[in-house]
Amino acid sequence: MCIRDRANAFKAACGPAGANIVYDIVGGQYSEPALRSIAWEGRFLVVGFPAGIAKMPLNLTLLKSCDIAGVFWGAFTAREPVKFRQQVEELFDLMKAGKIDPLVSETFPLEKGGDAIAKLESRQAVGKLVVTMD
């Protein structure tokens, strides 16, 4: 699928106004079409790039009047532990209130925790993997 076709598919999924926030955890050939589908004054978050480091025409940011921001989660947790703790607490509150429902794709008993790690390392995990201690 070419960039324009992929961008049109993203736009169709987001609606005519486009996406207010793009959370790009893939990168590579998917980043430019995602940026093309962003709404006016949207926000594009660069989180990861397992598909490769994207090369995008930056004039799209001007045409969309949008922002691109890098999100380095590991550094954030180390540099701003108080904010990190507050955000985790807020996420758990939202989950408890039923406002968000994280995708748990698989649950492992503690003795199979290594299998969960192997699945993460091989990028086979979809959603969250949970290791239980019962």
PLM segments and residue spans:
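Solvent-exposed, non-membrane alpha-helical residues enriched in polar/charged side chains
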Residues: 7, 11, 35-36, 59, ...
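A broad detector of short, well-ordered amphipathic alpha-helices
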Residues: 32, 111-114
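C-terminal capping/lid region of NAD(P)-dependent oxidoreductase domains
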Residues: 16, 20, 92, 97-106, ...
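Glycine-rich beta-to-alpha transition loops that act as phosphate-gripper elements at the mouths
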Residues: 25-28, 103, 107-109
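Adenosine-nucleotide cofactor-binding segment
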Residues: 1-30, 80-86
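Short acidic-hydrophobic, aromatic-tinged amphipathic segments that line or gate anion-handling sites
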Residues: 4-6, 107-111
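Glycine-rich phosphate-binding loop and adjacent beta-alpha segment
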Residues: 29-100, 125, 132-134
